[in-house]
Design a protein with these regions (language model features):
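Structural alpha/beta surface segment adjacent to cysteine/selenocysteine redox centers
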Residues: 60, 66-164, 282-374, 465
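Short active-site neighborhood of thiol/selenol oxidoreductases, capturing the structured segment around
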Residues: 48-64, 78, 82-83, 264-278
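Short boundary motifs at domain starts and secondary-structure transition points
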Residues: 42-49, 256-264
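An N-terminal domain-cap segment
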Residues: 30, 35-52, 56
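C-terminal cap of thioredoxin/glutaredoxin-like
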Residues: 2-7, 11, 20-26, 34, ...
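Short, contiguous strand/loop micro-motifs
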Residues: 59-60, 97-98, 185-186, 274-275, ...
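Conserved strand-turn element in the central/C-terminal portion of the radical SAM core barrel
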Residues: 59-61, 126-127, 270-276, 340-344, ...
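Soluble or luminal CAZymes and related metallo-dependent hydrolases
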Residues: 102-106, 190-194, 279, 317-321, ...
Length: 467
């Protein structure tokens, strides 16, 4: 059996050893191998005399794709690359656990992203199926039968996508009515083969979502990861003009806390992490900055890792998560180095001590140490000697704390935390919840790349309450 098949079985059923799992995770997140691969790919491209080709994968039913297509014209004008636009189907269900929640979350998330980056998102519901069919048919016609410049095709794509998300068909009817007689004959009989090439390419490139770019063995998801692609192209001197370094600017907001009466603050931030998540690991530093910088109450609410909740993570998704988390971590000065995945008994032991440690005020510090051990030092957090040293380093009594290893109360606590997380339409980590004490107000965000939304909301509330 090929190793990839073993990996596939492993990530859903835990059928290979932890040592193999840990090595694969380290390979996928290795900073050294990451940059070595970039050098190797550029040498290969030069040897094969290939142009710089960036692939973009668009899905008409994906709200993130609607946002991303709006920056394509800027991208083409800014970089000396060949952009190939391909179309893809919805991802397989194995990549989207909790599918209905996933769809609802994406709609809400895309709306937030659009407002933050000055993009347009016209609707808060999925497009109608009959409109999707017509939209793909029109694009299929222009893609294969009509002579059109790439810029004009991008403008057409934005026009079609906007109409689709508005659930209006006037634009479609206008386009179809503009066809000549022969064009209408071709249009009426044309088979829709638009998705075939895109689906095959996306799979070959080891990815699964639309709204993504691919350049020389590396995937970049939507406007969120566009900065990584732009950095790489700029390093290759492919920027056409001396302009802003990024198409999407990630503005930072600041708030003056000097004259604030902190006794009046009633904001609370809840942080939902899990011990096997590289995205959670790279978020701890920024989460700490939030509760140290802003006058908010803070509580950490750990949950079980997805794999310990019987959720499947296919190997291609696991590989992308590790490589992307490492790439994002480097952006914030947090390195993934040696990995020891705590799935199973190590996580259970470590979690069992959390309630008493948290009651003593060290819950966040404890989990932060565990995450550093899992993703930087490569230590087994389930070993008794490790736990004893970690507890002692926190200034706590090991003889008292270790008694909780016999207690199963942590299971109920983590399950309650999970239910709270699900209440906000989130099933993955890290999740953050901002709330007002003695109020029904709750604001959820999921993902280390959404921490800035929580910060922005805190600032907005503080500015409103304290002009």
């Amino acid at each position: 059996m090929k190793i990839i098949n073993k990996i596939s079985n492993f990530f859903s059923k835990k059928t290979i050893s932890s040592s193999i799992r840990n090595k694969l995770m380290m390979d996928w997140s290795s900073e050294e191998k990451f940059f070595e691969n970039r050098i190797k790919r550029e040498k290969l491209r030069l040897f094969e005399k290939r142009p710089h080709i960036v692939y973009y994968f668009h899905s008409l039913t994906d709200p993130y794709s609607h946002l991303t297509c709006q920056i394509l014209e800027n991208f083409v004008n800014k970089y000396d690359v060949e952009l190939k636009i391909l179309f893809v189907s919805d991802p397989h269900n194995v990549f989207t656990p909790e599918k209905k929640m996933f769809e609802d979350y994406c709609l809400n998330d895309a709306s937030h992203i659009a407002k933050y980056h000055g993009l347009k998102f016209e609707n808060a519901s999925q497009p109608k199926e009959k409109n999707i069919v017509i939209a793909y048919k029109i694009l299929n016609f222009y893609f294969f039968q009509k002579e059109i410049t790439q810029i004009d095709f991008i403008k057409l794509l934005i026009k079609i996508s906007s109409s689709l998300w508005l659930n209006e068909t006037d634009t479609f009817n206008e386009i179809i009515s503009s066809f000549g007689e022969k064009e209408k004959e071709i249009f009426d009989t044309l088979e829709n083969s638009l998705l075939k090439e895109g689906n095959n390419k996306l799979s070959d490139f080891g990815y699964y979502f639309g709204s993504s770019f691919h350049y020389e063995d590396e995937n970049y998801w939507g406007v969120d990861r566009l900065n990584h692609l732009e950095d790489r192209l700029s390093e290759l001197n492919l920027r056409k003009e001396n302009s802003q370094p990024y198409i999407i600017n990630y503005s930072q907001n600041n708030f003056n806390l000097e004259n604030l009466d902190q006794g009046q603050i009633d904001l609370k931030v809840d942080f939902f992490p899990s011990l096997n998540s590289p995205y959670t690991y790279i978020s701890f530093k920024r989460i700490r900055e939030i509760f140290e910088k802003y006058p908010v109450k803070f509580e950490v609410k750990p949950v079980l890792p997805m794999l310990m909740r019987n959720m499947k993570i296919p190997p291609v998704k696991a590989k992308y998560i590790l490589s992307d988390a490492a790439r994002e971590g480097r952006k914030y000065g947090v390195i993934i180095k040696k990995i020891y995945s705590p799935i199973g008994k190590p996580a259970e032991r470590a979690y069992s001590l959390f309630p008493i440690i948290n009651d003593k005020g060290y819950g966040f510090d404890y989990l932060e140490k565990l995450m550093e051990s899992c993703f930087f030092y490569g230590e087994n957090i389930g070993e008794m000697k490790y736990l004893e040293k970690t507890i002692s380093d926190l200034g706590l009594s090991w003889s008292e704390i270790k008694e909780e290893l016999k207690n199963n109360d942590w299971k109920k606590l983590l399950n309650n935390n999970l239910n709270e997380m699900y209440k906000g339409g989130c099933w993955g980590v890290p999740t953050l919840r901002l709330s007002k004490i003695n109020s029904d107000y709750e604001y959820y965000q999921w993902g280390q790349d959404r921490i800035h939304f929580i910060e922005k909301e805190i600032i907005s509330i503080l500015n409103f309450n304290h002009p």
